[in-house]
Regions:
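Sec/Tat signal peptide C-region and signal peptidase I cleavage site
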Residues: 4-8
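Short loop/turn motifs that connect adjacent beta-strands in outer-membrane beta-barrel proteins
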Residues: 23-32, 74-75, 133-139, 205-211
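Short glycine/proline- and aromatic-enriched beta-strand/turn motifs that initiate or cap beta-hairpins
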Residues: 9-81, 85-92, 254-272
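Transmembrane beta-barrel strands of outer-membrane/channel proteins
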Residues: 34-44, 80-86, 141-149, 201, ...
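Flexible glycine-rich, low-complexity coil/linker segments exposed to the extracellular/periplasmic environment
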Residues: 31-33, 167-184, 238-258
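Outer-membrane beta-barrel domain signature
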Residues: 25, 52-56, 113-117, 132, ...
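Predominantly the C-terminal beta-signal and adjacent terminal strand-loop region
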Residues: 200, 206-272
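Gram-negative (and chloroplast) outer-membrane scaffold detector with strong preference
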Residues: 70-181, 188-195, 265-272
Length: 272
């Protein structure tokens, strides 16, 4: 009877262990599952500031990264990280209307100058990762290839035209060459090529839903193109538009760690 009791107890212990192991593995994505994720840092910053009483707390979603991955097997996946930044600002400034002032020196009539700034940046990382672990917390390692593109362009629009009668019109912005005004300022487009390795861990707090942390090393090379400025000026009473090359193309390389400041590279992932 004692031996039967011990056998039954051992069998029950083994059953509970298998049940626990099965329930843990049920939290993980399986081969053929697709995942989408986003950075957790902005949300954790917001919650942290809310609990410590920071005034003017707001959710800052700028500079966010989207994550996508597809599981080839239960323990391996291909992945894609996409970061898009597109910024445009329009500045309007009042200036004296030169034509009205010529007709009436006491005129206070104003018109507008406008400066339009555009910045675009794109970064794509494609890679492969392998997972290892039998409980809800499991680690991973992998490698990435990276491609990035960026450009900057500033355009100007003026209320007072540059003419033979008004070769030095009133303009809102300074810092321009004598007798000339910018129409465009364009920095050379930049291309980034990189290869890297990464490691990290994920915790599945719900089936197919996890929070993860990742850090890595990236070797990258940046190639910058020709920059130029477009200006308007008067030459011997003739209106002339000049294209001036201001930056020669360049090339640089670097070695970077992929771990931002606040919480590290934390992210949420949802699989289906």
């Amino acid at each position: 009877m004692i031996s039967l009791g011990i056998y039954a107890q051992d069998e029950n212990t083994e059953f509970q262990s298998n049940k626990s192991q099965r329930s843990s593995s049920d939290y993980f994505p399986k081969a053929g599952d697709f995942g989408i994720g986003f950075e957790a840092t902005p949300f954790l910053d917001y919650l942290g500031n809310a609990f410590n009483g920071t005034s003017g707390n707001s959710l800052n979603l700028g500079d966010n990264t989207l994550y996508f991955r597809y599981f080839l097997t239960d323990n391996s996946a291909v992945r894609l990280a996409l970061q898009i930044g597109s910024y445009k600002s329009v500045e309007n400034e009042y200036v004296l209307d030169d034509a009205a002032a010529m007709n009436d020196p006491l005129s206070q009539k104003q018109i507008q100058d406008r400066r339009i700034s555009n910045e675009d940046s794109y970064l794509v990382r494609a890679g492969y990762q392998v997972f290892k672990g039998n409980n809800r917390l499991r680690g991973f390692v992998g490698g990435d290839l990276a491609f990035g593109y960026g450009r900057e362009l500033v355009e100007y629009e003026y209320g007072n035209s540059m003419t033979n009668l008004n070769p030095d019109p009133t303009t809102a912005w300074g810092g321009m060459p004598v007798g000339k005004r910018y129409l465009e300022q364009k920095e050379g487009s930049s291309i980034i090529l990189g290869v890297g390795a990464f490691t990290g861990a994920e915790y599945y707090f719900m089936p197919n839903v996890s929070i993860g942390v990742e850090l890595g090393l990236l070797y990258g090379q940046m190639i910058s193109g020709q920059g130029y400025e477009k200006l308007e000026t008067m030459v011997n009473s003739q209106y002339v538009v000049e294209d001036v090359e201001v930056e020669a193309g360049s090339r640089g390389r670097g070695f970077f760690t992929g771990m931002p400041s606040s919480y590290g590279n934390l992210y949420f992932m949802i699989h289906f």
